[in-house]
Amino acid sequence: IPAAKAIRRAGIAVIIANPRQTHQFAQSQPLTKTDAKDAKMPAFFAQMTAQKEDSQTMPYQPPTEAEEVLEALVNRRNQPADMRTAEKNRLHQVHETQVGSVKQLIAHFDRLIDELDKQIDNHTHTHFDGKDQVAEQIKGIGSITTATLMAMLPELGRLSHKRIAGLAGIAPHPREGGETKFKSRCFGGRSAVRKALYMATVAATRFEPLIRDFHQRPLSEGKPYKVAVTACMRKLLTISNARMRDYFAEN
C-alpha cells in the first residue's frame, strides 16, 4: 500500500490486483521462466487489465488524510474489542480466584473502547460532511459500523452492487462442472467489513422491518440460518451502497 500511494501521488495510474489473478495469469503464459520474464509479467497483466472495458479492478485512489486517520482509529478499536471478546470467553474457564482479574481487564477494555468510540464519532462528524449519517438512517447500522464501512470499504457508493458485495466477500460464487452443480459459496473479501455487517444485520433483523421480512423469507423456505443472514448482509450492503451513491450524486 505505501508503494501504491507513492506511485499514485506521482501521477501514475495504479491498480492493486488480486494475487490469485496475477498468479493464474503468470501460469497461463509460456513455460519459460527467467528473472527478466518475471519482471515483465506485472506490466503485461496491467496492460491486459487496462484494455478491458468492464475491468473488475477499480483504479487505486489513495485515501485522504482524514480517511487514513479514520482507518487507524477503526483498526485500533478492533484490537481491544477482540481482546475483550477473548477475555469474556476466558471468564467461564478460569479458576474462581482469577475471575476478578479477568473482570478488571474486561472493564479496562470497555473504557478504552468507549474512548475510541468517542474519537471515531468526533472525527467522522468533523471531517466527512454528513457522509457518516447516510448509512445510519438504516436501523441496525450504527456509528461504528458506518465508520468501518467508510474506512475499510472506501469504494462504497462508487461500484455496482455486485462488485461491492464481492469486495466484502458476501457474493455467492457458482461452482459447476459438467452436469454437476455444487452449492454456491462466498469466500475472500475484507473480513473487517464482513464482521461489521454481520453485527449490523443481527440488529437489523430485529428493528428494521425490510430486513426482518427479508430474513424470514429464506428461513420459511427451509434454508439454513447462515444463508439467510448472508443474504441480509448483502441486502444491507446494497442499500448502503445505493444511498452512498445518491449522496455522491447530490454532493
Language model regions located:
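Phosphate-backbone recognition surface of nucleic-acid-processing proteins
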Residues: 143, 149-221, 225
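Helix-hairpin-helix/helix-loop-helix acidic hairpins
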Residues: 88-144, 153, 205-208
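Short, conserved catalytic/metal-binding motifs centered on acidic residues
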Residues: 18, 38, 42, 80, ...
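Phosphate- and other anionic-substrate recognition elements at nucleic-acid/protein interfaces
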Residues: 1-100, 107-108
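Acidic, carboxylate-rich catalytic segments that either coordinate divalent cations
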Residues: 206-251
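Short alpha-helical scaffolding segments that buttress acidic/His motifs in well-ordered protein cores
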Residues: 45, 70, 149, 196-201, ...
